[in-house]
Amino acid sequence: MDFPGFKNSTVTVDGVDIAYTVSGEGPPVLMLHGFPQNRAMWARVAPQLAEHHTVVCADLRGYGDSDKPKCLPDRSNYSFRTFAHDQLCVMRHLGFERFHLVGHDRGGRTGHRMALDHPEAVLSLTVMDIVPTYAMFMNTNRLVAASYWHWYFLQQPEPFPEHMIGQDPDFFYETCLFGWGATKVSDFDQQMLNAYRESWRNPAMIHGSCSDYRAAATIDLEHDSADIQRKVECPTLVFYGSKGQMGQLFDIPAEWAKRCNNTTNASLPGGHFFVDQFPAETSEILLKFLARNG
């Protein structure tokens, strides 16, 4: 999906093409999507930010127009550490050594890892509608498991989830898209939905998304356990949907206060995909936070 006024391109990182779109002038902002979306999720937000910033919206490896390599046995090529390295290389390719990072869902987890691994690069971090990966796994109970069942389904050994999803990818991914609290089909722009469907009908994307969750339950959890005493130092916006399942199951601000030294909290009365429900309000909150931490 093309954004008006944005230029599409790719950067090759260790043999993997990472797709992105860029526009605007001013302090750089990297925007990263989550599951099961791609960079199209920012279509109604990025143009507003580009009036004041250089905005880069990229696809994570395994998603959208980025390459979708076969997962390695140790899952390292789908770890958040690798995702973060990919995106750092995109920004350095564009000439940005330091930048703001806005991440929803898996993009937020990628941002958390980047802020730990490359603190010199991240001017500010925005994490959208998540708690840290470690907290998700360590605090799973019957309510969390019932709401976030896909975390445990997608991590099952190949080819079980790939085969099941592949029978009807629209049904599976749309169950996720419309099932995580206060979101309905009319909240999503039709062009954006078309971009998501085109992506997730690709068997390689199905494998990529499963690999992402397999990595989270193994190598990412190992990395997070090793870094449990470390905190993010940059200004961090904790932004979530107050009517979503994450906001109802967790004290999201409290969880991030354990992992970050400088947090600001914001919420909108939506679900997990509050960006789609409230694009104008999302843009306004982001612009104010970025201006304060420019």
From Swiss-Prot:
User: Where does this protein come from, organism-wise?
Assistant: Moraxella sp. (strain B)
Active site positions, chain numbering: 105, 272
The family assignment reads: Belongs to the AB hydrolase superfamily. Epoxide hydrolase family.
Which of the seven top EC classes does this enzyme belong to? hydrolase
Indicate the segments forming the AB hydrolase-1 domain, all copies: 27-277
UniProt name for this protein:
Haloacetate dehalogenase H-1
What Gene3D superfamilies is this protein classified in?
A: alpha/beta hydrolase
Q: Name one GO cellular component term.
A: membrane
Q: Which domain of life is it from?
A: Bacteria
Q: Hydrolase: present as a keyword of the record?
A: yes
Annotated keywords: Hydrolase, Plasmid
Catalytic reaction(s) noted: a haloacetate + H2O = a halide anion + glycolate + H(+)
